[in-house]
C-alpha cells in the first residue's frame, strides 16, 4: 500500500513549509507506509493548457472543444521555462518551474517524487506533441540537477527517489523516443503518464517498457480500474495510482467481485446485508446496504467516506492477489477467474 499526494494542492494549502515542519507528508497524516508526490505538472496544466473538461478519454468519442480550452479560458500558460497559473482557490498567480517543483516536493518529503513534465492530451497536434516532448526532456535534466543539489543540501533528511515521466501521447515514435531519452538519465524509476486511450493503453505501456531499463521500477500514472490494472501488469507496469475508487464512490458506485453496482438503487433500501458480503473492509464489516443507501439519499458526506474505504480496500486487495498469483505462477488462471466473474456482474449492474 502507498499514498500518492498532490504537490499542487499541498503547495496551495496548507503549504510545503508546514508539511516540512511536520516531518514530511507521511508524518503529517500519520501514514506508516510509502508515499509518492506528483510534480504538480498535471494539475497545473489541467487548469487550461492541456485540459478543459475531461482527461480519461476515448479519442473517438471526445471532441477537441471538450478538452482544449480557449486561450481566454485558461488558468495556466506554459512556456519553455515553466508554467504560470492562477490558483483555483483565490485567483492568486503562481509560477511552477522544474526547480520549484523539486523544491516543493523535497519539502513535502515523500519517499518517491516525479519530475516536472508537460502532460498533453490525445487531441493535441503531432507537432505540438513533438515540441512538448522536447520541453519535458529539458525539464527532466533540470529536475535531476536541482534534485541532486537539494539532496546534498538536505543531507540529514531521508533520501527521496526521483522518477522521470514518459510522455508522447498515442504516438509510438514519440513514446519510444521519450523512454530512450529519459531511460538514459539518472532517474530512480519512471512514471508512464499522459492521457491514454483505453483501447491502446497496453500497447503504449509495452512500447515504453521495451525501451526503459529493466532494473528500474515503472509506475503507471492515473490507472486504477480492475481491467486496466491487469493490462498494465502484463505490459510491464509495477505500481499504479488512481482516483477512480473515490471518484466512483462519490456517485454511490461500489466495487464487488460480481462487478460494480450502485448502492443508491431502490432494491437496497431494505437490504440489511453487508455492503459486500465477501469483503472484510471496515465499511462492510460494520454497515449494511440499507444504511449506505440511506446515507447516499440523505446526501451525508459519510457515504463518500465509507464507500471510498471499501473501494480502496477492494483495489488494494486485488493488487495483492495479483502479486500472489504472479509469485505462485497462477496469474492467468486468477485473471480469467476474476474478470469472467467481474465482467458478467458488471454487465448486469
Q: What does each of the following model-derived ranges do?
A:
Residues 1-155, 266-269:
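Non-catalytic, usually N-terminal nucleic-acid engagement modules in DNA/RNA processing proteins
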Residues 3, 38, 105, 164, ...:
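Conserved, mostly hydrophobic/aromatic
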Residues 9-11, 42-43, 120-121, 169-171, ...:
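Short, solvent-exposed loop/turn segments at secondary-structure junctions
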Residues 16-25, 249-263, 316-319:
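C-terminal helical cap(s) of enzyme catalytic domains, especially alpha/beta-barrels
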Residues 100, 104, 131-142, 177, ...:
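A non-catalytic, amphipathic alpha-helix used as a structural packing/dimerization or gating element
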Residues 117-123, 276-349:
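C-terminal extensions of enzymes
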Residues 121-126, 130, 188-193, 301-304:
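Glycine- and acidic
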Residues 134-137, 146, 150-152, 157-275, ...:
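Glycine-rich phosphate/ribose-binding loops and adjacent secondary-structure elements
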Amino acid at each position: 500500500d502507498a499514498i500518492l499526494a498532490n504537490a499542487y494542492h499541498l503547495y496551495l494549502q496548507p503549504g510545503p513549509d508546514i508539511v516540512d515542519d511536520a516531518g514530511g507528508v507521511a508524518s503529517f497524516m500519520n501514514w506508516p507506509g510509502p508515499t509518492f508526490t506528483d510534480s504538480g505538472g498535471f494539475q497545473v496544466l489541467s487548469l487550461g493548457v492541456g485540459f478543459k473538461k475531461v482527461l480519461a478519454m476515448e479519442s473517438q468519442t471526445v471532441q477537441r472543444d471538450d478538452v482544449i480550452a480557449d486561450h481566454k479560458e485558461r488558468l495556466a500558460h506554459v512556456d519553455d521555462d515553466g508554467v504560470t497559473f492562477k490558483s483555483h482557490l483565490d485567483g492568486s498567480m503562481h509560477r511552477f518551474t522544474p526547480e520549484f517543483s523539486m523544491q516543493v516536493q523535497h519539502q513535502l518529503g515523500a519517499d518517491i517524487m516525479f519530475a516536472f513534465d508537460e502532460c498533453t492530451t490525445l487531441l493535441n497536434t503531432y507537432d505540438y506533441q513533438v515540441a512538448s516532448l522536447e520541453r519535458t526532456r529539458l525539464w527532466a535534466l533540470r529536475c535531476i540537477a536541482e534534485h541532486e543539489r537539494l539532496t546534498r543540501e538536505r543531507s540529514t533528511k531521508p533520501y527521496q527517489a526521483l522518477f522521470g515521466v514518459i510522455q508522447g501521447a498515442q504516438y509510438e515514435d514519440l513514446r519510444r523516443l521519450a523512454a530512450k531519452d529519459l531511460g538514459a538519465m539518472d532517474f530512480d524509476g519512471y512514471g508512464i503518464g499522459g492521457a491514454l486511450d483505453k483501447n491502446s493503453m497496453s500497447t503504449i505501456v509495452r512500447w515504453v517498457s521495451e525501451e526503459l531499463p529493466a532494473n528500474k521500477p515503472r509506475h503507471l500514472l492515473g490507472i486504477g480500474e480492475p481491467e486496466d490494472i491487469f493490462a498494465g501488469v502484463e505490459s510491464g507496469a509495477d505500481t499504479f495510482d488512481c482516483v477512480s475508487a473515490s471518484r466512483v464512490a462519490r456517485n454511490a458506485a461500489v466495487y464487488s467481485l460480481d462487478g460494480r453496482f450502485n448502492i443508491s438503487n431502490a432494491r437496497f433500501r431494505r437490504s440489511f446485508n453487508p455492503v459486500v458480503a465477501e469483503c472484510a473492509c471496515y465499511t462492510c464489516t460494520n454497515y449494511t446496504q440499507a444504511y449506505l443507501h440511506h446515507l447516499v439519499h440523505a446526501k451525508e458526506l459519510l457515504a463518500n467516506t465509507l464507500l471510498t474505504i471499501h473501494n480502496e480496500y477492494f483495489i488494494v486487495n486485488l493488487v495483492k492477489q495479483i502479486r500472489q498469483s504472479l509469485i505462485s505462477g497462477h496469474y492467468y488462471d486468477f485473471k480469467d477467474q476474476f474478470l469472467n466473474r467481474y465482467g458478467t456482474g458488471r454487465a448486469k449492474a
